[in-house]
Every structure is written in C-alpha cells, then in structure tokens.
Regions:
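Catalytic centers of hydrolytic enzymes
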Residues: 1-186
Length: 186
C-alpha cells in the first residue's frame, strides 16, 4: 500500500469519532454511535493524530462525503512524516482486503493467505509465552479539543482505573442503561 492509501484507511477509521465543536460548552459525545466499531482500526508501526474539529471524510459505508477535509494529522513512520508515494507492506484480514474500505480497496497488490487470525494469535502467544498487552500510544487526538466537555460511555468498572488518568473523569451513570452502540444519554 502507499502512504496515501494508508492515510485514506485512517480517514475511514476516524469515522468512529464525532465531530467536536471546541467552543461549545455543552457535553458532546465522542463516539459516533452510527459507525460500526468493527470498522475502526489502529495501524501499528505508525504514529498519527486525529483532528476531531473536522467532519468525517467518509460515511459509515466508506462513501466519500467530504472530499476536501482531512482528520489525519502528523502521520509518521519511524519518526519521519510519511511520503504519500512510499510503499508499505501491510498485513490485515480478508474483511478489509475484499471489501470497499477506502485506501485498502485501492491497494495495487493483495494476497489472500490461507491463514486464520485466531490461530495466528494463539500460535504467537504459545511461542512467546509472555505477552506485553500495554498499548503503545501511537495515536491520539489533536489537543485543539482539550477544553471541550467530551463524553463517552464505559463500564462502571472502569472507574477503578481512573486514578492515574488526568484527562478522563467519571461524570455519572448512563441514564438508559443500554450499551453496545445503542444511543445513550449521559
């Protein structure tokens, strides 16, 4: 894949998040509840930021809806800005390679290997014996939304993990009690 194709893939993934008005004093929902969460991807080995003040470039189906916008910023590989013509070897699943996902669908070369993701993960865990499960923090949001009241739903059990989080605080239970992509009211 080219750097440009990878950028479009990330533009599609950025649809997971709502557009945020940094000047609003009203609570704003971070997660776009109409976006299928299985279409959100993190691409490891790269670093990047999302500018949530911009609208989504693609709709939930991968249709281009805002051609002249970009949410992907500071896209880099090994600390250097990505050359959009640079080529990368990317390994992903057949859902992405055979679908209509922006960027991925335009890749010049696609090989379907007879491998199953689950078995590959099992084999890796068995061979490594110890797995570092911590996130490497390779992506983030631009700080231009830092003063907005941004909210998202999570399990009440997550409260126990907030002690070391300066940027996240508990604001209360969800009124509807519904989860898993169903609209909610904080």
């Amino acid at each position: 894949m080219t750097g440009a194709q990878i950028k479009e893939w990330l533009e599609m993934s950025a649809g997971q998040f709502n557009q945020i008005d940094p000047n609003s004093k009203e609570p704003q929902q971070l997660i776009n509840s109409s976006y299928p969460s299985y279409n959100y991807d993190v691409i490891d080995g790269l670093t990047y930021k999302f500018d949530l003040t911009q609208p989504n470039k693609y709709d939930r189906e991968g249709k281009l809806v805002n051609q002249d916008v970009s949410r992907v910023r500071d896209l880099a590989y090994q600390g250097q800005p990505i050359d959009l013509n640079q080529t990368f070897l990317v390994v992903t699943n057949n859902y992405l390679t055979t679908g209509n996902f922006p960027g991925v669908k335009d890749a010049a070369e696609k090989r379907l290997l007879n491998l199953e993701n689950r078995q590959d993960i099992i084999d890796y865990i068995v061979s490594e014996k110890t797995i570092n499960q911590s996130a490497d923090g390779n992506w983030s949001f631009l700080p231009n939304i830092a003063n907005a009241d941004i909210r998202f739903a999570s399990s009440d059990n997550a409260r126990a993990h907030l002690a070391n989080q300066d940027a996240i605080s508990y604001v209360g239970p969800i009124n509807t009690g519904r989860i898993c992509g169903v609209p909610f009211d904080c």
